[in-house]
Regions:
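Compositionally biased terminal segments of proteins
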Residues: 1-189
Length: 189
């Protein structure tokens, strides 16, 4: 990734965060971009954002995305279907090539905690990122589903570069049954 490409991706992140703030849609950044904030920088092909959007907001949101990325990929039908079927949709910025994966927040205690603990980090604009603890837990959930060791490497990176609330982390690992993945992470250290 070139410096210009990286700059364009950050610009895209900022534009999307500003729209979400303007529309008062709660959100946080997770995935590889969050790993780069709390751990070692790493390449990621997409931007993962969890949003608390309700179906009545889809038209306004879609309109803003179409204005922001007039030559990009914005599929209103996919956005509407995210509430009925798949729980996610994406938008592509043609200038940076960045694919933004939007995940509709699921109901549950852990998801509520993720929104409560999300922190604004200044990347040229104060964008909300998941907390390092919740990033680790999310990565353990993804590892449990996919088996990809990339998630374990990301966790190791976040652990080595962030101040972590171990009590909070241990509590949620137990509640969500993520001990097996957590044991694998500890074996990497």
């Amino acid at each position: 990734m070139t410096k210009k490409q990286s700059f364009l991706e950050i610009e895209t992140l900022i534009k999307v965060a500003k729209v979400l703030d303007e529309l008062k849609i709660p959100y946080y950044v997770s995935g590889g971009y969050a790993v780069s904030i709390y751990g070692r920088p790493r390449f990621t092909a997409d931007l993962d954002m969890v949003i608390k959007m309700v179906p009545v907001q889809t038209d306004e949101f879609s309109g803003h995305m179409e204005t922001l990325f007039p030559k990009g990929y914005v599929d209103r039908e996919q956005i509407n279907n995210a509430f009925k079927e798949i729980g996610e949709f994406n938008v592509i910025d043609p200038e940076s090539g960045l694919k933004i994966d939007f995940f509709i927040a699921q109901k549950g205690d852990f998801e509520e905690e993720c929104f409560k603990k999300a922190k604004r980090k200044d990347v040229g604009y104060k964008v909300k990122f998941t907390s390092p603890e919740n990033l680790i837990i999310s990565k353990l959930l993804w590892y449990k589903d996919s088996g990809s060791t990339r998630h374990l490497e990301d966790i190791e990176s976040v652990l080595s570069n962030s101040n972590i609330d171990k009590k909070y982390l241990d509590s949620w690992i137990k509640k969500l049954g993520l001990e097996e993945g957590w044991d694998r992470v500890k074996a990497l250290e």
